[in-house]
């Protein structure tokens, strides 16, 4: 269902691009915008992993310096029939995780020290299984395709703003101006809808890979609470980065057309249904109670040492 929804939304985005090109007039400008946007996004696609990891100051870890965490990821990768991804740790109190890489053979997964501090092993397993599901579903490729078309729409809208309206009269001018201003917002709405659909798909995939949907649900509740309270410097500098993470990198309430992720309560309900399907149902996490508790999220000071190998500051 999520793949069907994604396909339909991609088709809608493409149709929007074609309609904008037709409104402005002529296919030449539309093709130029598409080629330029595709070139920009192709560069991003091939270099996204290094760009994103450098942006977060991530450091790669291995079985020698972080054996338990790397071993956990390796076990999940085997279950998912995926190549072993590169594993990274980000020294940040903000609790979150993400996957990057253009395909499964070039994938990387990353988690913050803040995440490792507040989740138990089963919850960490659920989170990393979710990220590997993104890798397996090739969500990086899908979102790059989406960004290419959305970027082309924005470029074409700018082209139309400066060159399109002056060559028309009367109602055509009004239609062009309306299209130029409305199309980019419509494209962003569709782009965010695709992002939300991919998150539901990764939640299901993560539950299947780990076999612990209730642990993933519990992790989402804790992470959403912590991520809303502990600032994320990367997202503050670049709000578009919020789409990278397992939970939004900033505080927001409920679903909206411009949200990069479904509401956490809805994701938990979705995972409860999956748990029932798998016959592993258990009491669901009390998201409301978690959200109301102040000071419930701890963090890992970078100078503190712990004995667990899941904490990269530990000695393994």
UniProtKB/Swiss-Prot annotation:
Signal peptide: none annotated. GO terms for biological process: proteolysis. Belongs to the peptidase M48B family. The active site is at 131. Keywords: Cell inner membrane, Cell membrane, Hydrolase, Membrane, Metal-binding, Metalloprotease, Protease, Transmembrane, Transmembrane helix, Zinc. InterPro entries: HtpX_protease, Pept_M48_protease_HtpX, Peptidase_M48. The chain crosses the membrane at residues 16-36, 145-165, 174-194. It comes from the Bacteria. The keyword Transmembrane applies. It is found in: Cell inner membrane. HAMAP family: Pept_M48_protease_HtpX. This is Protease HtpX homolog. It is an enzyme of class 3 (hydrolase). GO terms for cellular component: plasma membrane. Its cofactor is Zn(2+). One of its GO terms (molecular function) is zinc ion binding. Residues 285-316 are annotated as: Disordered. It is a multi-pass membrane protein. Binds 1 zinc ion per subunit. Its EC number is 3.4.24.-. Its main location: membrane. Zn(2+) binds at residues 130, 134, 199.
